[in-house]
Regions:
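Expand to "…catalyze enediolate/carbanion chemistry for C-C bond making/breaking, isomerization
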Residues: 95, 139
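Active-site-adjacent beta->alpha loops and helix N-cap segments on the catalytic face
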Residues: 3, 32, 55-63, 83-92, ...
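Hydrophobic faces of well-ordered beta-strands that scaffold small-molecule active sites
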Residues: 19-25, 45-49, 77-83, 101-103, ...
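Active-site cofactor/substrate anionic-group-binding motifs, chiefly glycine-
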Residues: 41-94
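N-terminal glycine-rich phosphate/pyrophosphate-binding loops that anchor nucleotide-derived ligands
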Residues: 22-38
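N-terminal amphipathic alpha-helix/helix-capping segment at the start of soluble metabolic enzymes
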Residues: 1-24
Length: 142
């Protein structure tokens, strides 16, 4: 069908009283399997491009893979950059066509992470893309 935005997928799922599933992609084989299974169950999906995949495949090729798979199915696919470590990788993903970004600045100080998160938020607004941020961690004392 097509590449879509996370906002649209979530709105459609809510209207249909349905769900959206996200899968971390490691390569062609699992990406195509995820899409095939989603197509069979008529479930729109998020294909997540994490750091592991990006070590072995350029972002442009990852997006091209997601785009090709979207043309071979009846479902909608959200291309998602997972754990983008800095502004540049997030911008590059948006320039290529990713519609959803997860910025992970958790290794920075809280203040620096928050400032970077706000800059990336402003960037995603220009692209009409969704943003998820990792601001830190939760600790539980037992």
């Amino acid at each position: 069908m097509s590449i879509d935005s996370l906002t649209n997928l979530l709105n459609c799922a809510k209207t249909r009283n349905n769900y959206v599933v996200g899968f971390v992609v490691q390569g062609w084989e699992d990406a195509s399997s995820f899409v095939r299974a989603a197509d069979e169950t008529e479930t729109d999906i998020i294909l997540q491009s994490g750091p592991g995949l990006r070590k072995n495949m350029p972002l442009e090729l990852i997006y091209a893979m997601f785009e090709k798979l979207s043309g071979e199915t009846n479902i909608k696919i959200v291309p998602h950059l997972d754990h983008g470590e800095n502004y540049d990788i997030c911008k590059k993903a948006l320039d290529i066509g990713f519609t959803s970004i997860m910025y992970d600045g958790s290794k920075l100080s809280f203040k620096e992470n928050l400032n970077q998160s706000l800059k990336i938020y402003e960037l995603t607004q220009k692209y009409n893309a969704c943003l998820e941020v990792e601001l830190g961690f939760l600790a539980i004392m037992i």
